[in-house]
């Protein structure tokens, strides 16, 4: 009986990628980011190991959604106290904390366990075009989230 080869975590190379979120669709962008964070784009993917890469997202303030989601999509947070639920639309949250929109979308696509929390720390989201990770020499990754017959 053959054994499944496991990747050696010491020799595993983790790259840094920069993704520009300007005029990209939120859900499709988050799907691609989650796949890279998990390492599903690599031949060495193992479900229970951290084989993914680091992702830097810039221009988070310019991410788009289709239809009426700009006004109708809501984000909820709760203080835990009676009557402490705060509801905020996509449009208002994008003006206030644009990074949180992409973080929320990607976090929902990662495993809900300790590995998922570890993978989430490898995501760096910035509202503007600048990021402080030049020392890691990130590779620019072009993602097209607008469908061919899209609007």
Curated annotation (Swiss-Prot):
One of its GO terms (cellular component) is cytosolic large ribosomal subunit. PROSITE patterns: RIBOSOMAL_L13 (PS00783). InterPro entries: Ribosomal_uL13, Ribosomal_uL13_bac-type, Ribosomal_uL13_CS, Ribosomal_uL13_sf. One of its GO terms (molecular function) is mRNA binding. CDD domains: Ribosomal_L13. It comes from the Bacteria. Keywords: Ribonucleoprotein, Ribosomal protein. One of its GO terms (biological process) is negative regulation of translation. This protein is one of the early assembly proteins of the 50S ribosomal subunit, although it is not seen to bind rRNA by itself. It is important during the early stages of 50S assembly. Belongs to the universal ribosomal protein uL13 family. Part of the 50S ribosomal subunit. This is Large ribosomal subunit protein uL13. The lineage of its organism: Bacteria, Bacillati, Cyanobacteriota, Cyanophyceae, Oscillatoriophycideae. The gene is rplM.
């Amino acid at each position: 009986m053959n054994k499944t080869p496991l990747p050696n975590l010491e020799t595993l190379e983790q790259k840094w990628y920069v993704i520009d979120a300007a005029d990209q669709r939120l859900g499709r962008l988050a799907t691609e980011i989650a796949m890279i964070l998990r390492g599903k784009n690599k031949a060495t993917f193992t479900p229970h190991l951290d084989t993914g890469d680091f992702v830097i997202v810039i221009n988070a303030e310019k991410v788009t959604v289709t239809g009426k989601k700009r006004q109708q999509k809501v984000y909820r947070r709760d203080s835990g106290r009676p009557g402490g639920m705060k509801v905020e639309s996509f449009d208002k949250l994008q003006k206030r904390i644009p990074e949180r929109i992409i973080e929320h979308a990607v976090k929902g696509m990662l495993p809900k366990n300790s590995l998922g929390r570890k993978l989430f720390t490898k995501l760096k989201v910035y509202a503007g075009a600048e990021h402080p990770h030049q020392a890691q020499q990130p590779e620019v990754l072009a993602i097209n989230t607008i469908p061919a017959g899209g609007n």
